[in-house]
Amino acid sequence: MTVLTAVFVGGTYMGVRLLFSKPPSLPEVAADTCRNRTLERGEQLSTNQVRVNVLNAGGRSGMANRTAINLQTAGFLPGTVGNAPDEVRIGNVRVVAREPNRVDARLVGAQFKGKVQYTKGVPGDDANVEVLIGKKFVGMKKKPVTAMKAKNRVTICVPDLTEPVS
């Protein structure tokens, strides 16, 4: 009986210590989720090297999600999908990128029918490009453009596929 009491007291003591102990720390995640890649003039950038966020600015439910799925089918890496702020007004499609004339922005813009507006800005999260779908969205081209040549030498942050998107 003494042995059982000792096991019970010891187990209770260990259990209470574990219950109130500091949890183990999570492993550190690298701050960079992409690596720089320099493309020389004429070198190709493919869709699987571009992460795209898609935001709905048109009000039709599900447009951003459907467009994101279609872009993934074309080979683009998925980014954030959601709604644009209420004050944003878009006709067909707006492509937002750090450099709107750069090959990654042009490759994304080449997927859409109709007039595509290019705007300089910083896409959210770790995306290279952000697409805003407007009220007059006419859709995506039936045959996707899967690669595009760089018009000039450019350094692009290519998503690191070893890190999961959150």
Residues covered by each model-derived region:
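BRCT (BRCA1 C-terminal) domain core and associated BRCT-interaction motifs
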Residues: 66-68, 74-138
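A broad, low-specificity signal for short, low-complexity segments enriched in glycine/proline
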Residues: 10-17, 39-42, 52-57, 89-96
